[in-house]
Amino acid sequence: DFYHDPVKKCRLIISEDRNNFLLITLGWEDDVQVHGCLVHIEVIGDKIWIHRDGLEDGIANELVKAGIPKTQIVLGFHPPNIRPHTEFAVN
């Protein structure tokens, strides 16, 4: 399984000065490099913007479980016209 493969790793990248947080995959699958962004979160004002959510259960759900209200979370990976139809903040 990917998360326990010693050749592939997940890395957390934090840019506190720019309020960006990324979880990336890095490694090798045979002779092909694996490199991609699983999660990209940015803090903008008082909202948490999720630009990329590649987790199976969703990082938004984990943030809600941690006590962050849905009104403070924007699903930025959805187009603006779709966001009002989610349970989360629009912008």
Positions of predicted regions on the chain:
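Terminal domain-initiation and capping elements
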Residues: D1-N91
